[in-house]
């Protein structure tokens, strides 16, 4: 069996420690050697990003320049249509073949809305889900049929992610950082410091570009 590949999607507007540090911990916990970051172009589930795709891509490049764990996949940025995880995972599965273990990393908040995602039922056909826990969010789905779906696919053994190509959901005990892109944008608009919230090269670039003012 080939090594587990993990994908991490998001808007990253801007990228910050709340994105990077939990995933770095996750990698150590379950034995990931590479995490591919996939920034959205037009996210279908949330407001449009304030920074454009070129700026968000550059901030990510700055953030991961000294972090060999991470690599960047630009495919969604090159689409002129909404970015759907189901579509991206189908492409990855076709490129990697049927036997490579593949996982998609999401937050616990995203798990609760997961049944509203485009073609959500196909996602586990192509990948595992790794859920980073977050305080204040329930561990149960809102509807009984979705709770059953969760329980049917749930595993408590991260080794299962390495041994099967897709189909499992793993709830990871990752640290939670009280950081969000919204908080960072509000701080910047108010002229407050963000030095402790995101990598220094990213903050320097934000100031150079006059972003989030």
Swiss-Prot record:
EC number, as in UniProt: 2.7.7.18
GO annotation terms (biological process): 'de novo' NAD biosynthetic process from L-aspartate; NAD biosynthetic process; NAD biosynthetic process via the salvage pathway
Keyword Nucleotidyltransferase on entry: yes
Catalysed reaction, written as an equation: nicotinate beta-D-ribonucleotide + ATP + H(+) = deamido-NAD(+) + diphosphate
Gene3D superfamilies in alphabetical order: HUPs
Pathways involved: Cofactor biosynthesis; NAD(+) biosynthesis; deamido-NAD(+) from nicotinate D-ribonucleotide: step 1/1
Key words, A-Z: ATP-binding, NAD, Nucleotide-binding, Nucleotidyltransferase, Pyridine nucleotide biosynthesis, Transferase
Job of this protein: Catalyzes the reversible adenylation of nicotinate mononucleotide (NaMN) to nicotinic acid adenine dinucleotide (NaAD).
InterPro entries: Cyt_trans-like, NadD/NMNAT, Rossmann-like_a/b/a_fold
Regulation: Activity is susceptible to product inhibition.
Pfam hit, one: CTP_transf_like
Family, as annotated: Belongs to the NadD family.
GO molecular function terms listed in the Swiss-Prot or TrEMBL record: ATP binding; nicotinamide-nucleotide adenylyltransferase activity; nicotinate-nucleotide adenylyltransferase activity
Designated name of the protein: Nicotinate-nucleotide adenylyltransferase
Organism: Escherichia coli (strain K12)
PANTHER family in UniProt: NICOTINATE-NUCLEOTIDE ADENYLYLTRANSFERASE-RELATED, PHOSPHOPANTETHEINE ADENYLYLTRANSFERASE
């Amino acid at each position: 069996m080939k090594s587990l590949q993990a994908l991490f999607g998001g808007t990253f507007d801007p990228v910050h420690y709340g994105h990077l540090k939990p995933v770095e911990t996750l990698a150590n916990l379950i034995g990931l050697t590479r995490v591919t970051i996939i920034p959205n172009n037009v996210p279908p589930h949330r407001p449009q990003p304030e920074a454009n795709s070129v700026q968000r891509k550059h901030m990510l490049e700055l953030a991961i320049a000294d972090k060999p764990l991470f690599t960047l996949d630009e495919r969604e940025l090159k689409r002129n249509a909404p970015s759907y995880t189901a579509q991206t995972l189908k492409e990855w599965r076709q490129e990697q073949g049927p036997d490579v273990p593949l996982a998609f990393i999401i937050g616990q908040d995203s798990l609760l809305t997961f049944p509203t995602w485009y073609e959500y039922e196909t996602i586990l056909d192509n990948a595992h889900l790794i859920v980073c826990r977050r305080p204040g969010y329930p561990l149960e789905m809102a509807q009984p049929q979705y709770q059953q779906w969760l329980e049917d696919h749930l595993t408590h053994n991260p080794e299962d992610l390495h041994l099967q190509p897709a189909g499992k959901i793993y709830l990871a005990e990752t640290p939670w950082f009280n950081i969000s892109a919204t908080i960072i944008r509000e701080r910047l608009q108010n002229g407050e410091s963000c030095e402790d919230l995101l990598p220094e090269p990213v903050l320097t670039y934000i100031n150079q570009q006059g972003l989030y003012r």
